[in-house]
């Protein structure tokens, strides 16, 4: 029976047996309101860490891994993912930001800050004696009101392949808080071009598998470019092979350039010079045979997933057949998609109809180093693209990649659903007022919960104002008063201090699906946390029983 390894049978004075379970005194337990408050404290602590990273003036965090690797970022999902979080409920917040990142790609910081604020408000209601489940029910009702209100205040942004201004502005908003903000025009253009290159506008679908984001240290972020094709971090297998091939016919191989070997363990005994020469001749004959297969198919470039030795390399050079070796599986697949080629597992299967085609394949060198990359351009399938990111150090390249990922996701979300709400806390302030208005119509305890939900929504504009160096309470009350007076849902916090609170004029927008997801995910997490009222931590098995 499970669990009896820490139990012992003993007898009392009368000889009656009973079981004594050891290590019970080592178990720790939190119960009831204490447990709920412990969870709320953990979530508030995590939310406060990322709160200062919210908005265009949000600050970055330095994260140092156990092996000394440094990451500088203000991306909420990355900060939480790389933090050493031990508390079980705090781990749920990490998963919350990850699910927002996986589903929407942007708004990871906002969803964590909102969840922390909702639980902070719940703590105040618990102190007043309201049951956690009643609070969770009120939050669910308030969330439905807020989501419905978002639909009502949303605007539609029009775009087409010829007119991408609105997509460009949306991507620019996403990049405003990132390390690449000085080059946000350039990155926004790249994001829009990349997404439109692979998008199916009829089906409103974007295949992110066709967008590869690669990077190399050196140059500045302004040197980042979009390649209509594939960039591979490899070079030609021999320095004397041509560095530029036009009208390339590419054989994409997953079989090694080497003589066949038995699949079982084997040993070859060579006892004389003639036997060794015969083996050499056999190997050479096999190499020649493989090269003939490739040549007969009409290929003028070989891309191989495996390596090949110097002898094979020399024979390829002699036969004027440029080759690239040790190309990874994902790159092989992308090259096959881009060039309309087929991945060939055996030389015997190679034929002209399985070759990929590209206008130009060129080798590019960097600075004074011997670093080289292979660029495959003017491909048969123009839908595959690569963004090649540059930066002065690895940290900037990595953060630029993360920033670009957010911008790509924003553009993709608008292609899926082109309805938007306004940023700068405008949507949250408008929802807060709508929830407060609805709460006044509801009698009973739910009114308190809905009011708390409305107060929690105000945390986003408060944090934006705080991070921008404004007086947070004054900025929020001023904008809220204008919302009530003018009934304009596009008035938000002037984070960049342009002198206008009109987010429509500044074109600070958030995709509607992203904002809805934030509210729904944060509310679901709060319900889960408020329902847990007991924590039992088992004692360590390593301790001896005394």
Curated annotation (Swiss-Prot):
Function in brief: Molecular chaperone; assists the folding of proteins upon ATP hydrolysis. Known to play a role, in vitro, in the folding of actin and tubulin.
GO cellular component, one term: cytoskeleton
Subunit field text: Heterooligomeric complex of about 850 to 900 kDa that forms two stacked rings, 12 to 16 nm in diameter.
Top-rank taxon, per record: Eukaryota
Lineage: Eukaryota, Fungi, Dikarya, Ascomycota, Taphrinomycotina
Entry-linked NCBIfam families: chap_CCT_epsi, thermosome_alpha, thermosome_beta
ATP-binding as UniProt keyword: yes
Family: Belongs to the TCP-1 chaperonin family.
Gene: cct5
PROSITE patterns xref list: TCP1_1, TCP1_2, TCP1_3
Annotated keywords: ATP-binding, Chaperone, Cytoplasm, Nucleotide-binding
Identification of the protein by name: T-complex protein 1 subunit epsilon
GO biological process terms on file: protein folding
């Amino acid at each position: 029976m499970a669990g009896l390894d820490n139990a012992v049978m003993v007898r009392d004075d009368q000889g009656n047996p009973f079981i004594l379970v050891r290590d019970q005194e080592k178990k720790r337990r939190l119960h009831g309101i204490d447990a709920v408050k412990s969870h709320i404290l953990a979530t508030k602590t995590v939310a406060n860490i990322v709160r200062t990273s919210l908005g265009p003036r949000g600050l970055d965090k330095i994260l140092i891994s156990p092996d000394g690797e440094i990451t500088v970022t203000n991306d909420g999902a990355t900060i939480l993912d790389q933090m050493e979080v031990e508390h079980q409920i705090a781990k749920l917040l990490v998963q919350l930001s990850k699910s927002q990142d996986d589903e929407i790609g942007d708004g990871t910081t906002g969803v964590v800050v909102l969840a922390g604020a909702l639980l902070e408000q719940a703590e105040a209601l618990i102190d007043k004696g309201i049951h956690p489940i009643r609070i969770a029910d009120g939050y669910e009702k308030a969330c439905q009101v807020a989501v419905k209100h978002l639909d009502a205040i949303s605007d539609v942004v029009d775009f087409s392949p010829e007119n991408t201004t609105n997509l460009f502005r949306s991507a620019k908003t996403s990049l405003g808080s990132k390390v690449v903000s000085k080059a946000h025009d350039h990155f926004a253009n790249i994001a829009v071009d990349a997404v439109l290159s692979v998008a199916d506008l009829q089906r409103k679908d974007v295949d992110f598998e066709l967008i590869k984001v690669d990077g190399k240290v050196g140059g500045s972020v302004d040197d980042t470019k979009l390649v209509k094709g594939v960039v591979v971090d490899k070079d030609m297998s021999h320095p004397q092979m041509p560095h530029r091939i036009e009208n390339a016919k590419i054989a994409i191989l997953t079989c090694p350039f080497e003589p066949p070997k038995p699949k079982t363990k084997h040993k070859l005994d060579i006892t004389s010079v003639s036997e060794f020469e015969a083996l050499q001749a056999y190997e050479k004959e096999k190499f020649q045979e493989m090269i003939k297969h490739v040549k007969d198919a009409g290929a003028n470039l070989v891309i191989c997933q495996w390596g090949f030795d110097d002898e094979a390399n020399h024979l390829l050079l002699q036969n004027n057949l440029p080759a690239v070796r040790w190309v990874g599986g994902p790159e092989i697949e992308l090259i096959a998609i881009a060039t309309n080629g087929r991945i060939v597992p055996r030389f015997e299967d190679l034929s002209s109809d399985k070759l990929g085609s590209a206008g130009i394949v060129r080798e590019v060198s960097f600075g004074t180093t011997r670093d080289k990359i292979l660029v495959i351009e003017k491909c048969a399938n123009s839908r595959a693209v690569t963004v090649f990111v540059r930066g002065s150090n690895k940290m900037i390249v990595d953060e630029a990649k993360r920033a670009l990922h957010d911008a790509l996701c924003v553009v993709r979300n608008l292609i899926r659903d082109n309805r938007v709400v306004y940023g700068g806390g405008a949507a949250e302030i408008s929802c807060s007022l709508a929830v407060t208005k609805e709460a006044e119509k509801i009698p009973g305890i739910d009114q308190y919960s809905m009011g708390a939900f409305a107060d929690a929504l105000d945390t986003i504009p408060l944090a934006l104002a705080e991070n921008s160096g404004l007086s947070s309470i004054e900025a929020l009350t001023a904008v809220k008063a204008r919302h009530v007076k003018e009934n304009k849902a596009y008035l938000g916090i002037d984070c960049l201090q342009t002198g206008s609170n009109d987010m429509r004029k500044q074109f600070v927008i958030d995709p509607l699906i992203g904002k809805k997801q934030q509210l729904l995910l944060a509310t679901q997490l709060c319900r889960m946390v408020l329902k847990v009222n007991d924590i039992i931590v088992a004692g360590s098995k390593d301790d001896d029983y005394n």
